[in-house]
Curated annotation (Swiss-Prot):
Gene3D superfamilies, A to Z: 2.60.40.640
One record GO biological process: intracellular protein transport
Compositional bias segments (type: Polar residues): 315-324
Species of the source: Caenorhabditis elegans
UniProt record similarity statement: Belongs to the VPS26 family.
InterPro entries, per the entry: Arrestin-like_C, Vps26-related
Entry GO CC: cytosol; endosome; retromer complex
Region listing for Disordered, in residue ranges: 301-356
Residue ranges with Basic and acidic residues bias: 331-342
Keyword annotations of the record: Protein transport, Transport
Name of the protein in question: Vacuolar protein sorting-associated protein 26
Role according to the record: May play a role in vesicular protein sorting, similar to the yeast retromer proteins.
Pfam families in UniProt: Vps26 (PF03643)
Signal peptide segment: none
């Protein structure tokens, strides 16, 4: 993918990454609200490539005071534009001050770059990673930026705890709901059930929604924005006592990002499952339950020299995977061997307050 930038009538710059032909491309929402293609990276991966400066006129002298490239990780809060926070800032000098009389190429490399957070484009905040090339000139510096997308990978044990809770209105409604776990990866399926223990109000329908809440700032400068990113009707009609309603919600079809906690001490992203019942008088009864969403690695990283590594050596592991499991045991060499083989809440009518 060629990224071009015009220097008036003098020159143009092109940033080419080393592995463009094989690196995965994903879509991400830009400032214009449209989806754009970007190269995908993970935590710990090196970012390497070449900067091309091409002169538009042959034998034309192009003066500069130096050329550099930066790798930047940045958080920008929209209500405080112009006050971005760079949590990563790496610089490589490509050329000293001088003149260019012909097209020039400058290789660059940022080895094993730490990328602790996931790329995020929110309602009031954005987190981005990008390369910036700067050609320093006497009057105005010339710059070009190339955005990269970073995915933060995680791995959780399969024996996640389920969520069970009984809620109700005294002598009117008493239900028990259950979700199979409280942590879901972005391609997961939410499975659960609703069991009606007591029904003395006329229920018209019931739905489950996924609410995304973005919290930016702290104290009096806190901005909280919530939106419904998914909604699914799970029952139409009046239930009876003893009836059980199954829940099955596929997450893969929705535009979701992982849950985030106090990223750069600037913002958090939380998700809630919102169970809503509506009666025949259009009164709404609801109960929210927070869940964690995480991005699953396609391939689990293996330790070099282990049996699992031998089984997986024909596949490529994705770097930057954060695992939450116990480390694998290592077999120590035997002394006699010359060689060793390493190896409860209530529901109420909706009056602008959560019943939880």
């Amino acid at each position: 993918m060629a990224m071009l930038f015009g220097f008036g009538q003098s020159a143009e710059i092109q940033i080419r990454l080393s592995n463009e032909d094989t690196r995965k491309i994903v879509k991400a929402r830009g400032d214009d609200g449209n989806m754009h293609d970007h190269f995908l990276y993970y935590d710990g991966e090196s970012v390497t490539g070449t900067v091309h400066v091409n002169l538009k006129k042959a034998n034309h002298k192009f003066e500069h005071q130096g050329i550099r490239i930066e790798f930047i990780g940045q958080i920008e809060v929209y209500y405080d534009r112009g006050n971005q926070q760079d949590f990563i800032s790496l610089t490589r000098e490509l050329a000293r001050p001088g003149d260019l009389t012909q097209n020039a190429q400058f290789p660059f490399e940022f080895n094993n770059v730490e990328k602790p957070f996931e790329t995020y484009m929110g309602t009031n905040v954005k987190l981005r990673y990008f390369l910036r090339v700067t050609v320093i000139r006497r009057l105005t510096d010339l710059t070009k930026e190339l955005d990269l997308v970073v995915h933060a990978l995680s791995s959780y044990p399969d024996n996640d705890k389920s969520i069970k809770m009984e809620v109700g209105i005294e002598d009117c409604l008493h239900i028990e709901f259950e979700y199979n776990k409280n942590k879901y990866h972005l391609q997961d399926v939410i499975v659960g059930k609703i069991y009606f223990l007591l029904v003395r109000i006329k229920i018209k329908y019931m739905e489950i929604a996924i609410l995304k809440t973005e919290v930016v700032g702290s104290g009096p400068n806190t901005f909280k924005e919530s939106e419904t990113v998914a909604k699914f009707e799970i029952m139409d009609g009046a239930p009876v006592r003893g009836e059980s309603i199954p829940i099955r919600l596929f997450l893969a079809g929705y535009d979701l990002a992982p849950s985030m906690r106090d990223v750069g001490k600037k913002f958090s992203v939380k998700y809630f499952l919102n169970l809503v019942l509506v009666d025949e008088e259009d009164r709404r009864y609801f109960k929210q339950q927070e869940v964690t969403l995480w991005r699953k690695a396609d391939k689990v990283m293996r330790r070099p020299g282990t049996e699992d590594d031998e089984e997986e050596k024909q596949t490529t592991s994705i770097p930057g995977t954060q695992k939450f499991t116990a480390p694998a045991p290592v077999e120590h060499p035997k002394p006699e061997s010359p060689r060793s083989d390493p190896k409860s809440g209530s529901t109420s009518p909706d009056d602008n307050s959560d019943s939880s």
